Amino acid sequence: MSTATPATQALKRAGVGFRTLEYDYVAGQDRIGLHAAEAIGTDPGRVLKTLMVEIDGKPACAVIPSDRTLSMKKVAAAFGAKSAQMMPPDKAERLTGFHTGGISPFGQKRRAPVAFEVSALNVPEIVLNGGRRGLMVALPPADALAAAEAQASDLCAAQG
C-alpha cells in the first residue's frame, strides 16, 4: 500500500527525513496508540497519539504519548485558553482530512495550532501517525516540532 499521504507529503515539503512503519490497523480498537506501539514493537511512550481538541471553541491539536492521558486544563493553558474539550470524531475528520485512527499533526486539511507533550521529546526518535490508519512515521522530535510548527508544552495528566 502507498505511503504517500498528505502527512508524508508535508514532511517531504518541509525537508524532514523520516521513515515509515506499517502495521495492521484493527477497527474498533479502544486504545489505538497502544495497539500501534505493540504492533510495531516500540515503547508506547515513544509512540505519540494526535488528539484534536477545541480550545475556547477553536480547533487545536495535542500530541501526547500513547500511554498517557491528556489534561484538558493543561491543554487550555498551553494554548492560552480558558477551556478545552475533545473534538467530536466526525468534526476532527472533516477538519483534518484524516480518518480517526489515522490523524496526523502534519498535512492537515485545515491547519490548527499544534502542541507536543514536552516530556515525550527527550528521546532520539518519536513515532506518530502518518496520515493513514496503519501507517506511522518515525523522526527526531526536533524535526517533528519544526514540521508541525508546534510548541512543546506540559499537556498530560499526572501519572499515578
Question: What spans do the regions from the language model cover?
Answer:
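Extended, low-hydrophobicity, polar/charged segments
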Residues: 1-160
